[in-house]
Amino acid sequence: MRLNTLSPAEGSKKAGKRLGRGIGSGLGKTGGRGHKGQKSRSGGGVRRGFEGGQMPLYRRLPKFGFTSRKAAITAEVRLSDLAKVEGGVVDLNTLKAANIIGIQIEFAKVILAGEVTTPVTVRGLRVTKGARAAIEAAGGKIEE
């Protein structure tokens, strides 16, 4: 067996439709597009969301909400990630140095997810009630 002798199993690869190649092919002349109309023309068709001139759904419904610009610079930090920080002090800069949060992050909040085993000092970060209890139970402390 050689690479140049390999071929797919008989009948496993179906040939694509060859449109407009004569009446005998079954797909000649109009090529499966029917007669006349916008969809039969070259480049024909309507844009996404078009409902034939009726006011489309995306314009009938009211606008709502907004995209918070603060969300892009805020991060959640899991309790289990605190162990990845070198030294016992966790703040915004040490989290960035340990690649736990991105460089553009300005606010971080420690959440109760995973476990903290070593005592750590959390400085200048927001901390949830559950995370605060877990950090203090492990012998750590939170400084504002």
Swiss-Prot record:
Sorted UniProt keywords: Ribonucleoprotein, Ribosomal protein, RNA-binding, rRNA-binding
One Gene Ontology CC term in the entry: cytosolic large ribosomal subunit
InterPro entries found in the cross-reference section: Ribosomal_uL15 (IPR030878), Ribosomal_uL15/eL18 (IPR021131), Ribosomal_uL15/eL18_sf (IPR036227), Ribosomal_uL15_bac-type (IPR005749), Ribosomal_uL15_CS (IPR001196)
Pfam families per UniProt: Ribosomal_L27A
Ranges of compositional bias, category Gly residues: 21-31
Domain of life: Bacteria
GO biological process entries: translation
Annotated HAMAP family: Ribosomal_uL15 (MF_01341)
UniProt xrefs under SUPFAM superfamilies: Ribosomal proteins L15p and L18e (SSF52080)
Molecular function terms from GO: rRNA binding; structural constituent of ribosome
Originating species: Escherichia coli O1:K1 / APEC
Protein name, entry field: Large ribosomal subunit protein uL15
Residue numbers spanned by region Disordered: 1-54
Assembly mode: Part of the 50S ribosomal subunit.
Family (UniProt): Belongs to the universal ribosomal protein uL15 family.
Its job: Binds to the 23S rRNA.
